[in-house]
Amino acid sequence: MIEKMVKESEKGILIDIEVTTNAKKNEIGKINEWRKRIEIRIKEQPIEGKANKAIIKFLKGIFKSEILINSGTTSSQKTVLIPDKTKDDVVTILKKEIKSI
């Protein structure tokens, strides 16, 4: 299932995420099978780009890689880009981090 949310592109690896702000802590949640997205919980509020910055910082720490928001900068549904990892690397890391796996 997770492989459907991680896609290869010319620029790198794309991950479809669903963001919840104002969380108790920053964490990767579970797979939202209905929306086909990985849930990310962030402590920051979505004000003046604070949540987006927190998402980037949080995911950089997990993937040890550059992270860019590819689409959805003003939405809770986003696609992030990891330009310097393989799909297998990303899937392996996510499987270790996701709560429901």
UniProtKB/Swiss-Prot annotation:
* UniProt-recorded name of the protein: UPF0235 protein MMP1055
Top-level taxon = Archaea
Listed Pfam families = DUF167 (PF02594)
Q: Which InterPro entries match?
A: DUF167 (IPR003746), YggU-like_sf (IPR036591)
Q: Which NCBIfam families match?
A: DUF167 family protein (TIGR00251)
What are the annotated GO cellular component locations?
cytoplasm
**PANTHER family reported for this sequence:** UPF0235 PROTEIN C15ORF40
Organism from which the protein derives: Methanococcus maripaludis (strain DSM 14266 / JCM 13030 / NBRC 101832 / S2 / LL)
The UniProt entry's sequence similarity note says: Belongs to the UPF0235 family.
